[in-house]
Amino acid sequence: MLETQGFVLLPGLLTPDDCATLAAEVDKYLPLQDGNTARPPNSGGQRNLLKYPWCKALAERLQGMPAIAPLLPTSSVAVQCTYFEKTRARNWLVPLHQDLSIPVAERVEHPALRGWSEKDGALFVQPPARLLQELLAVRLHLDPCQGEDGPLRVVPATHQLGVLTPRNAQALRDASGEVLCVADLGTALAMRPLLLHASSKSTSNRPRRVLHFVFGPATLPWGLAWSKAVLS
């Protein structure tokens, strides 16, 4: 299903104890607002989690899991982990899009590279689609995520179509419709970053906490290097 549809849900990848432990690690390491137990309301995500030992260990563990390992080439490395925490107080929607940027160590001038940017102190670039097609995102749900919790909505099979213009993306969604990716506690959503996806605001009183890992090839073309890379 991953190769044909661009995504697959993997129920029960993490146990309830795993989810509780990971949520506690996030609370321990990510900055809180004024020493309180709530992160700033305008801070929906934190991109640099791979610098923490617990996150590196989780990346290594994921690469060896029977449900994940067949989806990854043996030389794959974890290159990014972003934490998303959507609540009624810290809420957002994401319009239809593809994930086009990757985190790299330094800027390289090459005609194939575009869209240089800096996010949370890290350097990002948009490489050609042929590299993006090699990437795999794994989203770990630390909470149940139902329709009212702002889950991802995906347009199946659009990962095979390269980088799409906004007009083409909208036309594909209108023609094909969307799939709502609801998930139980501990479920993982594995997806290709070029898959068209969006999400709505949460209308529930429950948190929607997700650890979003990205895996890719160990070496990059065009003189690029990953900003971080974790090999199992």
Question: PLM features: residue spans?
Answer:
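A structural signal for short, well-ordered beta-strand segments
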Residues: 81-83, 138-140, 211-215
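Non-heme Fe(II)-dependent double-stranded beta-helix
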Residues: 1-4, 11-118, 232
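Non-heme Fe(II)/2-oxoglutarate
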Residues: 32, 160-172, 176-179, 185-190, ...
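Short, well-ordered beta-to-alpha junction loops that form the rim of enzyme active sites
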Residues: 13, 81-83, 141, 157, ...
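Short hydrophobic/aromatic beta-strand or adjacent loop that forms the aromatic wall/cage
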Residues: 7, 135-137, 208-210
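Catalytic core of non-heme Fe(II) oxygenases with the double-stranded beta-helix
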Residues: 87-182, 222-227
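Catalytic palm active-site di-aspartate
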Residues: 6-7, 186
